[in-house]
Amino acid sequence: MRNTDTPIAVEGYPFIAGFAAATLLLALLGQFLHLGFFVPATLFFVLTVFTVFFFRNPERVTPGDENTVVAPADGEVIFLGKVIEPHTNGEFEKISIFMSVFNVHVNRAPISGKVVDGFYTKGKFFDVRDERASFENEQQGLVLETAAGLRMVVVQVAGLIARRIVCYAKTGDSLSRGRRYGLIRFGSRLDIYLPLGTRIDLVMGQKTVAGETVLGILP
């Protein structure tokens, strides 16, 4: 897997460079040609600052207990319950986290384990707060297995605005809990399917911090 420890996620560099270049160009044109470029230059400057903010990639302090499942994403819990996960066709405890454009969008491994399977599904782009998004939207998933043999599934879901999923991990990789493994651009959702018997330690509407907030304790 790639190095993901930069303070700004590398996927944001092209956007930041483009907006910054446009800001500089418009400012120079306005300065030397005395043209009315102040407003568009200001607009692109604001876009540059927002893009830096959006692709921020802060360090996190992950709890030490290996049986603890941590949040894979910053955001708000919008679903809790038992479901059948469509890729494995198994029953799991499902937690869905909605990431707004104001949240950090870097995703982190919820547990330490090996990636035993990965899948990508083309799909639609429903609003990710709509439960249909879990099953019908474009998505990238990983099946993780712990050292104790427990399996769980973590799925990055694209949304109405977010249509670019980035996943660094692949089948055969080993992930440590809290490690960065991907991101989704510009607002999205992340679904995590935990083994039955996991003690869930959060409630609907709760805010989560990737790599730090405890979702539950494995059985």
UniProtKB/Swiss-Prot annotation:
Q: Which source organism?
A: Geobacter sp. (strain M21)
Membrane topology designation: Peripheral membrane protein
Q: Where is this site: Cleavage (non-hydrolytic)?
A: G187, S188
Assigned EC number: 4.1.1.65
Keyword GTP-binding listed:
no
TM region(s), chain numbering: none
**Subcellular localization:** Cell membrane
- Pathway assigned to this chain's UniProt record: Phospholipid metabolism; phosphatidylethanolamine biosynthesis; phosphatidylethanolamine from CDP-diacylglycerol: step 2/2
Entries under InterPro entries matching the protein: PS_Dcarbxylase, PSD-A
Give the residues annotated as active site.
S188
| One cellular component term from this protein's GO annotations in UniProt | plasma membrane
GO annotation (BP), single: phosphatidylethanolamine biosynthetic process
Q: Which HAMAP family match?
A: PS_decarb_PSD_A (MF_00664)
Describe how it is modified after translation.
Answer: Is synthesized initially as an inactive proenzyme. Formation of the active enzyme involves a self-maturation process in which the active site pyruvoyl group is generated from an internal serine residue via an autocatalytic post-translational modification. Two non-identical subunits are generated from the proenzyme in this reaction, and the pyruvate is formed at the N-terminus of the alpha chain, which is derived from the carboxyl end of the proenzyme.
Keywords, comma-separated and alphabetical: Cell membrane, Decarboxylase, Lipid biosynthesis, Lipid metabolism, Lyase, Membrane, Phospholipid biosynthesis, Phospholipid metabolism, Pyruvate, Zymogen
Major subcellular location class: membrane
Alphabetically, the GO molecular function entries are: phosphatidylserine decarboxylase activity
Q: Which reaction does it catalyse?
A: a 1,2-diacyl-sn-glycero-3-phospho-L-serine + H(+) = a 1,2-diacyl-sn-glycero-3-phosphoethanolamine + CO2
Q: What is this protein called?
A: Phosphatidylserine decarboxylase proenzyme
Q: How is the cofactor bound?
A: Binds 1 pyruvoyl group covalently per subunit.
Similarity comment: family membership: Belongs to the phosphatidylserine decarboxylase family. PSD-A subfamily.
